Amino acid sequence: MNGLRHRMAAVAAALSVAMMSAASEPETEILRPVTAAYTVEAGSSHIADTYLSPIRYAGWSAGFGYGRMQAMKFSPERWVMALDARLTAERALNRVGNATMWYWGVEARWAMMRRVRPLAGLTVGLGVGPGLKAGCLYSQRNGNNPASAKVALTVDLSAYAAWNIRVGRLPVTLCYRPVVPLTGVFFAPDYGELYYEIYLGNHSGLARMAWWGNYFVLDHSLTADLHFGNTSLRIGYSGQVLSTKASDITSRMIRHCAVIGVSGEWLSVSPRKKISPKARMIHAL
């Protein structure tokens, strides 16, 4: 009996020492730098909107974009967030060249994605999030209906694939980002309905449920970040296909653009708190 008591006391003492030792060890600090990019885009635009005209228009597109990605705080190894915003301006002419159509728009979306690393240097992520698209087409030739609003609030399916490689001695990050709305609501007036009528109170049926049969958008980009130093050069391609059909109105907008900009990783550090030498950094890409 005495031997059993001695063994139990020894086990209890060992557990106490282990618990005190674990409690005394500080948790490893996790650092989550933000991968951000500022870009400009320029390329071609193709527009067809039967609310304004049955004729197709073609011209140029230009825009400014901002994007950021960061590992999530609650599970940084498995989850990342992405925020993207873009301002766009487009000018297109009809085939004869005697009519002009303008488009101005803003887009913003956020997504939380689950990521995996199937191969060394390769990261793949998939998730969902909200998206907002608001813009306006304008044709001066139309007297009664000179403008066509494009507004949608959607739930988007977002994905990305990032591959960290070296070209010679230069580190390069290749990234492909596709986004497709799954569902949501979008603005769709009746065929021939004047905006003045809407202003007077004719609001029936303006908001339509979006699905791939009446509202389809593919927004995708392929970029390469050339890491020359703390700040990287981003080059690549950005494209968007928008197709809507509601109230006998068909709209098609296609954009292909070259992308150039700067990107890099930024980390907010408090001057009152030193970074632990044991801190662990988890990147978004």
What label would you give each PLM region?
Residues A22-A82, A92, H283-L285:
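Short glycine/proline- and aromatic-enriched beta-strand/turn motifs that initiate or cap beta-hairpins
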Residues A36-H46, L83-R91, L126-C136, L153, ...:
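Transmembrane beta-barrel strands of outer-membrane/channel proteins
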Residues N144-N230:
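Outer-membrane beta-barrel transmembrane domain signature
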Residues I254-L285:
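Outer-membrane beta-barrel "beta-signal"
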